Swiss-Prot record:
This is Glutamyl-tRNA reductase. InterPro entries: 4pyrrol_synth_GluRdtase, 4pyrrol_synth_GluRdtase_dimer, 4pyrrol_synth_GluRdtase_N, GluRdtase_CS, GluRdtase_dimer_dom_sf, GluRdtase_N_sf, NAD(P)-bd_dom_sf, Shikm_DH/Glu-tRNA_Rdtase. Pathway: Porphyrin-containing compound metabolism; protoporphyrin-IX biosynthesis; 5-aminolevulinate from L-glutamyl-tRNA(Glu): step 1/2. SUPFAM superfamilies: Glutamyl tRNA-reductase catalytic, N-terminal domain, Glutamyl tRNA-reductase dimerization domain, NAD(P)-binding Rossmann-fold domains. The gene is hemA. GO terms for molecular function: glutamyl-tRNA reductase activity; NADP binding. Signal peptide: none annotated. It comes from Desulfotalea psychrophila (strain LSv54 / DSM 12343). Gene3D superfamilies: Glutamyl-tRNA reductase, N-terminal domain, NAD(P)-binding Rossmann-like Domain. NCBIfam families: hemA. NADP(+) binds at G190, A191, G192, E193, M194, A195.
């Protein structure tokens, strides 16, 4: 009987506030995190996904181990009180874990249902895990299946038609506060994927002045040129606050980028013209105390959920269709997985029958001197056909729907191995 199982553990925007998520975000990169995961948990196969809205760990391991406790220690690493960890962490095993992964890949569990970023994030995480040898046959199959599920959902539903990214939700929030953005000056802090998406949406909304601040000036210039904007280094950031109206920050820094104490005197220079900050980074880039300054408005990634709700109703119908696809593909994967339990017995039964046929043919054919080669081949085909028909019922018995479930599979495997005297490990 299979003693290994698929487990999925995680925290996301639904279970855990950003103040906690930023403490456990793997800002040092996948290589460091995956190496730690292998050292501290040590599973047969493992995979880790870390985004602004979720951290999820997928493992294939011995089902008798207390994997949840081990993963919890790895994930929270003493940064969160132990009694709170249980409230934040979700733990799934077997089929529910598979269905959750497919749901995430299909963007049905995203803050913005239907957004396209999550699939790319899943694939990036997989490339790192695969390159480090963390994944194996089971997780490779499962993760590739999740990619195909996401593609099928995109193809067969309009889930992405009215979807917006987190970056676009930030732009929508800016419009809500300022109205027309044509005359507004915007500064992007960070030049990564989120910043680029924000720039695309801002230009689409009529913004004509974009400033990009980044630690790597070359990347800032590259992004600014793409949108007809201006690039600056991070040291010029505070000086630019005197002129801009909207700041969208999405760096990968592990510390606060813009401090409240530094902005206070700038507001006097601005004569208290409104300054709007949107922090879509995890860990957060912007000092939470900015909200205490007069005419300064700060929104973090969790606040964006209110903007996201505007488009939610238009996606509900397509989300139902997408959910049906996820359920169907989950069942298909389960059928394949259940088949792994009976496959060794199927092979053993066929090998035993083939061995019997070969043995009997070797004994019988030499005695039939009068038979020509054609007749001998006919006898061999006839015996093979009889064998195939004889095996049909027991093999069907093993693979039938009534065999689903590991306990039922194992009971039928044990029965057939006993009846046919099949030996060896399964």
């Amino acid at each position: 009987m299979f003693e290994k199982q698929v487990f999925l553990f995680g925290v996301n925007h639904k279970t855990t506030p950003v103040a906690v998520r930023e403490k456990i975000a793997f800002t040092d990169g996948y290589e460091t995190a995956l190496t730690r995961l292998q050292e501290e948990v040590g599973c047969d196969e493992s995979y880790l996904l870390s985004t602004c809205n979720r951290v999820e760990i997928l493992v294939y391991a011995d089902s008798t181990r207390d994997i949840e406790a081990e993963v919890s220690r790895f994930l929270f690493a003493g940064k969160v009180p132990e009694e709170d960890c249980r409230d934040y962490l979700y733990a799934l095993k077997g089929l529910p874990a598979v269905q959750h992964l497919f749901t995430v890949a299909a963007s049905l569990d995203s803050m913005v249902v239907g957004e396209a970023q999550i699939l790319g994030q899943l694939k990036t995480a997989y490339r790192h895990a695969s390159a480090l040898g963390c994944t194996g046959p089971l997780l490779n199959r499962l993760l590739h299946k999740s990619f195909s599920v996401a593609k099928r959902v995109r193809t067969e539903t309009a889930i992405g038609a009215s979807a917006v990214s987190i970056s676009y939700a930030a732009v929508q929030l800016a419009r809500k506060i300022f109205g027309n953005l044509d005359t507004k000056k915007v500064m992007l802090v960070g030049a990564g994927e989120m910043a680029e998406l924000a720039a695309e949406h801002l230009v689409g909304q009529g913004v004509s002045s974009v400033v990009v601040a980044n630690r790597t000036l070359t990347r800032a210039v590259e992004l600014a040129d793409k949108f007809g904007g201006t690039a600056i280094c991070m040291e010029e950031l505070y000086a630019q606050l005197e002129d801009v109206d909207i700041i969208i920050s999405s760096t990968g820094a592990q510390h606060i980028i813009i401090e409240s104490a530094e902005v206070r005197p700038i507001m006097r220079v601005r004569r208290n013209r409104p300054l709007f900050f949107i922090d879509i980074a995890v860990p957060r880039d912007l000092d939470p105390e900015l909200n205490e300054l007069e005419n300064v408005y700060l929104y973090d990634i969790d606040d964006l959920s209110n903007v996201v709700e505007v488009n939610k109703s238009g996606r509900d119908h397509e989300a139902i269709k997408a959910g049906c696809i996820v359920e169907e593909e989950t069942r298909k994967f389960d059928e394949w997985y259940q088949g792994l339990a009976v496959k060794p017995t199927v092979l053993a039964l066929r090998e035993k029958m083939s061995g019997i046929i070969e043995q009997e043919l070797r004994k019988t054919l030499p005695r039939l001197h009068d038979l020509g080669e054609h007749d001998q081949r006919s006898i061999e085909k006839m015996v093979a056909s009889i064998s195939s028909k004889f095996l049909h019922d027991p093999l069907h018995y093993l693979k039938s729907d009534s065999c689903h479930g590991r306990d039922k599979s194992q009971a039928k495997v044990d029965t057939l191995r006993s009846v046919f005297s099949l030996k060896g490990d399964i």
